[in-house]
Amino acid sequence: MAHQLLCCEMETIRRAYPDANLLNDRVLRAMLKAEETCAPSVSYFKCVQKEILPSMRKIVATWMLEVCEEQKCEEEVFPLAMNYLDRFLSLEPVKKSRLQLLGATCMFVASKMKETIPLTAEKLCIYTDNSIRPDELLHMELVLVNKLKWNLAAMTPHDFIEHFLSKMPVAEENKQIIRKHAQTFVALCATDVKFISNPPSMVAAGSVAAAAQGLHLGSANGFLSYHRLTRFLSKVIRCDPDCLRACQEQIEALLESSLRQAQQQNLDPKAAEEEEEEEEVDLACTPTDVRDVNI
């Protein structure tokens, strides 16, 4: 009798079936128009913030990414949370002692928008080492959504990746690996303040192009060659090909810098800190081989 009552069901998240109608050109045009309405200011560090520095944003963004990864959040949660954070910082001066509270609140709201089972206030407070209380986070949530005028359905680079892949004549197994690497690049870009000036569609296109280049897929498929893929993606998002190439090079340079810092931290943590302070911005002449990246 005891064995008959044993429940062996696995709790799985229910997902909708893919809808090809959501990937047509009309939807893409609407998305390209909508992304302009949710763009943060590129100069808020100079014009709005008195205490917050780019290095502080980098620290809190890295912490937010680690929380999202540990909680296995949907890929869209972290970039959406960073969109909220940048837009809020574009409008309201924030004390540096409140930056982590703002970051936690942005994750809290973004997870409600994208997760089936969102992050709880109590869990996020634990990740701050209980430096904030749940009631503080809930109050900050009201401040955040009111400041953003409840415009919370912002476009993120992830929204565009599927549109690009659906239009590319590429084998499904290659699409899967391009998607995975592009999603990783998008998260990496969200931690770097230099990419605030790039619209989500360009970050997505640059990430897809960088993934295809780094995986050397162009040798087997002429469509994925450097110039041909860049021209194709620039037409899709209606931008100058040179601007897209510059964005792609920035992504490759950021990846190379991140890999170099990670390797140095394993060897000499002190030397890695010194190099991070220098903030070198050298563009990679050749794409980083992303096959060496453990994603």
Swiss-Prot record:
Name of this chain's protein: G1/S-specific cyclin-D1
Entries under Pfam families matching the protein: Cyclin_C (PF02984), Cyclin_N (PF00134)
Acidic residues compositional bias, start-end: 273-282
Subunit structure, as described in the record: Interacts with either CDK4 or CDK6 protein kinase to form a serine/threonine kinase holoenzyme complex. The cyclin subunit imparts substrate specificity to the complex. Component of the ternary complex CCND1/CDK4/CDKN1B required for nuclear translocation and modulation of CDK4-mediated kinase activity. Interacts directly with CDKN1B. Can form similar complexes with either CDKN1A or CDKN2A. Interacts with UHRF2; the interaction ubiquitinates CCND1 and appears to occur independently of phosphorylation. Interacts with USP2.
Family according to the record: Belongs to the cyclin family. Cyclin D subfamily.
Limits of the Cyclin N-terminal domain: 28-152
Keywords: Cell cycle, Cell division, Cyclin, Cytoplasm, Isopeptide bond, Membrane, Nucleus, Phosphoprotein, Repressor, Transcription, Transcription regulation, Ubl conjugation
PTM description: Phosphorylation at Thr-286 by MAP kinases is required for ubiquitination and degradation by the DCX(AMBRA1) complex. It also plays an essential role for recognition by the FBXO31 component of SCF (SKP1-cullin-F-box) protein ligase complex following DNA damage. Ubiquitinated at Lys-270 by the DCX(AMBRA1) complex during the transition from G1 to S cell phase, leading to its degradation: ubiquitination is dependent on Thr-286 phosphorylation. The DCX(AMBRA1) complex represents the major regulator of CCND1 stability during the G1/S transition. Also ubiquitinated by the SCF(FBXO4) and Cul7-RING(FBXW8) ubiquitin-protein ligase complexes. Following DNA damage it is ubiquitinated by the SCF(FBXO31) protein ligase complex. SCF(FBXO31) ubiquitination is dependent on Thr-286 phosphorylation.
